[in-house]
Structure formats: C-alpha cells, structure tokens
Amino acid sequence: MSDDIKKYLDGLLQKVSGLYVIQITDRDGVPLLRVSQEKNVDFALMPSFIPTFTTACDQASKLGLGRNKTIISMYSNYQVVQMNKLPLILTFVGAENCNTGHILALEHQVDGYLEDIKQAVTEA
C-alpha cells in the first residue's frame, strides 16, 4: 500500500507547477512518507518545523474562530502549506509563486489515501 500512496503523491507533485515536496508526518513531526522533486528543500525536514505547526494550530484554535485546519506561510523563497489531518500533518512545500489554490485543492484528493496511514498511526 505504501508504494501505491507514494506513486499517487508523486503524480500529484507533477500536476502542480512549482510544488517541490509533499510530506506526511505524525503530530510530533516524525516523517512517515515523503515525495519530492530534484530540488533540495531540507528545511521541511527539520525536526522543529512540523511540531511548530501543531503548536500554531492549537493556539489559533483558541482565538474563538473554530478549529484550525490549514496554515499557509512563507519561508525564505518557499511557500509552505500545512494541513491538520489528525493524527497526521500533511505538508506541501512549493515555490513562492506556486498556485496556493491548486495546493489547497489537493486536500480532498488525498483524503482517501490517508485513511490507511491514519489507522496505522492510531494503532501504533
């Protein structure tokens, strides 16, 4: 199943112009799956980067505007879109001019593939 998911995510990576990395981690930032283009985007793998998203989501939820599902940010010359799919965090890293709407549209396309990973993480 892991190869199917990886192949599917790699296909999505090719569909969105300027998208460099799709990474799935658990809530603590432990990488579970990663697909990337040739361009090296190391900052997305930094151990503190993903848990910072989790903390930011928790804090944003306290604003009284409802549950936070997505955070879009800029880092250097990169655009980072992180989605809260508890117990998973889905991270997309693209060029600063990458179409954010295209990245956000991928959310519903990957939901079906995430179910098996969610179940494995929950059982572990």
UniProtKB/Swiss-Prot annotation:
Classification via SUPFAM superfamilies: Roadblock/LC7 domain
Listed GO CC annotations: Ragulator complex
GO annotation, biological process: cellular response to amino acid stimulus; positive regulation of TOR signaling; positive regulation of TORC1 signaling; protein localization
InterPro entries tied to this protein: LAMTOR3 (IPR015019)
Pfam families on file: MAPKK1_Int (PF08923)
Superkingdom field: Eukaryota
Transmembrane segments: none
Assembly and binders: Part of the Ragulator complex composed of Lamtor3, Lamtor2, CG14184, CG14812, and Lamtor4.
Function: Regulator of the TOR pathway, a signaling cascade that promotes cell growth in response to growth factors, energy levels, and amino acids. As part of the Ragulator complex, may activate the TOR signaling cascade in response to amino acids.
Family stated for the protein in its record: Belongs to the LAMTOR3 family.
Name this polypeptide is given: Ragulator complex protein LAMTOR3 homolog
Organism: Drosophila melanogaster
Name of encoding gene: Lamtor3
